[in-house]
């Protein structure tokens, strides 16, 4: 079965100081009760905006679809642009900044495991 999504800011919800459209997990049916192994969301950050600081026990990839920005990750900073793929290791605080005054920053985040594993 093919499952198709469309990235659409109009259905995004406010989370983490930006607009997020949850893509995965999707509603499961009776034939597929298991959670997928990862989560995904499209993120939209307004011009000049910054996300709230976030830290979670999940690894994350950010694929930049449009715009430019800066990622602050556990005391380190790097700039990025459309087409870049950023790797965020688990348990490291991060903040995303939109470097444009007139263009939304848009990316897709993939994170795993789907549910955070409790720290021992």
What are these model-predicted stretches?
Residues 31-35, 50-56, 97-99, 120:
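Short histidine-centered beta-strand/loop micro-motifs
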Residues 76-90:
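Short acidic-glycine-tyrosine-enriched beta hairpin
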Residues 59, 64-69:
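Glycine- and acidic-residue-biased ligand/ion/polar-headgroup-sensing regions
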Residues 102-118:
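A short hydrophobic beta-strand segment most commonly corresponding to one strand
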Residues 51-53, 71-72, 88, 94-101:
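Short beta-strand His + acidic residue motifs that chelate non-heme Fe in jelly-roll/DSBH
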Residues 1-37, 120:
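A short, N-terminal "cap"/entry segment at the start of jelly-roll beta-barrel domains
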Residues 24-29, 41-56:
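Conserved short histidine dyad/triad with adjacent acidic residue
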